[in-house]
Amino acid sequence: MSEAEARPTNFIRQIIDEDLATGKHTTVHTRFPPEPNGYLHIGHAKSICLNFGIAQDYQGQCNLRFDDTNPVKEDIEYVESIKNDVQWLGFHWSGDVCYSSDYFDQLHQYAVELINKGLAYVDELSPDEIREYRGTLKAPGKNSPYRDRSVEENLALFEKMRSGGFEEGKACLRAKIDMASPFIVMRDPVLYRIKFAEHHQTGNKWCIYPMYDFTHCISDALEGITHSLCTLEFQDNRRLYDWVLDNISIPVHPRQYEFSRLNLEYTVMSKRKLNQLVTEKHVEGWDDPRMPTISGLRRRGYTAESIREFCKRIGVTKQDNTIEMASLESCIREDLNENAPRAMAVIDPVKLVIENYPQGESEMVAMPNHPNKPEMGSREVPFSAEIWIDRADFREEANKQYKRLVLGKEVRLRNAYVIKAERVEKDAEGNITTIFCTYDADTLSKDPADGRKVKGVIHWVSAAHALPVEIRLYDRLFSVPNPGAEEDFLAVINPDSLVIKQGYAEPSLAQAEAGKAYQFEREGYFCLDSRYANASSLVFNRTVGLRDTWAKVGE
């Protein structure tokens, strides 16, 4: 990550500054602890930038730790994708990758310690009964009939759980805290449950697996984490985090701090809902360019720099809010406007024939790769008598506000000649199939000699040299700003979230690299789809338009 990216300020950094100033800590050690049960999304990017960014700015350490305590939902595929996403965003973890499963032996020992202290018991209520006994926000819970078992009985039963003597759902280990607590998380939470499933790291060694709240705090302590940063939904869980560490013989007690999660308009962040979109094939996969996943954004053409800039702009607070899509798009638009080379592509093509241009001949026209960056060089683009232009760039009749090609009037072809539309040819349905023009041979990249003004400029591609391309125009995945609030979020999927066009591009794009962004002049920013980089027909994804369209969406 570039050192030029300014160091942000927020309440968490203020806490760290104070901890260092008072000597509470002499170094900073954070962690990013995803569960490997899905692909990371833009919300995780905020946490990645926060945790790794803090470690980097304070010359500390940040661990990448996989919270792999549920083998049923986890997979090595997700482990690898998460590692790739973190590195792609420009960050590097300290030391080896950590896994909560690395600590399964120690976690088991601490569970036994709680049993010996009379602070944990084996419960044989069913999962439904446990929920019923837990009570509600308005009604206290009630004690399990198994709550007062002796230490010796609990130790024996816990060992029976570990050795496979119970079926799944028939027993669990619970903390013994307070069933009347105003905080439901403290009403004898489950610490261990039974799952007969092979684990991607430990195989079949275990059939009991610790719960997140028990694992998380102990893993932090074992790794020497100084500042454990979580999103606000874990605010009440901090009480359990502290209770566990206060009641086991572990010398280190990290502190948990909460910040607001990232909510983005016109999408969903729930892993369950994202998984449903994938498994029911509403999208192409986890890396579908309409998905809010980091892999989806990357495939769409977002850069790591733009995502880091977005996370910096939205900041870190305790106030939950929903970020407008325009905020994310402005970051990538600014990045690509500055750095993307230009190219020409026609998305909705119509043939244009220049009747007085030498037929069968062609010439090379010089074009800058960036209008404001001569250091990016130039390229040669072929020009001939037959070209493709965009259908929207021609009208038979138009008012003065229309600055493109009109029958009987002139327009300039980008970096080429001034042409005049003379007549059109139509099919049986009245659709224009060919526009016939003449050109001024003395206007190659210069104004007409007689001083007449030609205001409009349109882009083009030589028909004889054109590269056939598939162009995918992506829009928001949902038609309402907050689809997650809908009774059926699938009912508000935007039917026009993907429009596929068959167009033509200048031949230089045959050498385009997968994922590299280009500004298709007058159209928007596009990148070669990495999934189809080796296909016979190249596929370009629209990353973002040239202008903010979200203001209009909201009107």
UniProtKB/Swiss-Prot annotation:
In short, the EC number is 6.1.1.18
Where, by residue number, does L-glutamine bind?
67, 212
Which residues constitute the signal peptide according to the record? none
Q: Where in the cell is it found?
A: Cytoplasm
The entry's cellular-component GO terms read: cytosol
Binding site residues for ATP: 35-37, 41-47, 231, 261-262, 269-271
Region Interaction with tRNA: which residues?
317-324
Query: Which biological process, per GO, is one annotated for this protein?
Result: glutamyl-tRNA aminoacylation
The sequence motif named 'KMSKS' region is recorded at: 268-272
Its transmembrane ranges are none
Keywords carried by this UniProt record: Aminoacyl-tRNA synthetase, ATP-binding, Cytoplasm, Ligase, Nucleotide-binding, Protein biosynthesis
Motif annotated as 'HIGH' region, chain positions: 34-44
MF term (GO), any:
glutamine-tRNA ligase activity
Q: Which reaction does it catalyse?
A: tRNA(Gln) + L-glutamine + ATP = L-glutaminyl-tRNA(Gln) + AMP + diphosphate
Q: How does it assemble?
A: Monomer.
Family that this chain belongs to: Belongs to the class-I aminoacyl-tRNA synthetase family.
User: Which NCBIfam families has this protein been placed in?
Assistant: glnS, PRK14703.1
User: What is this protein's name?
Assistant: Glutamine--tRNA ligase
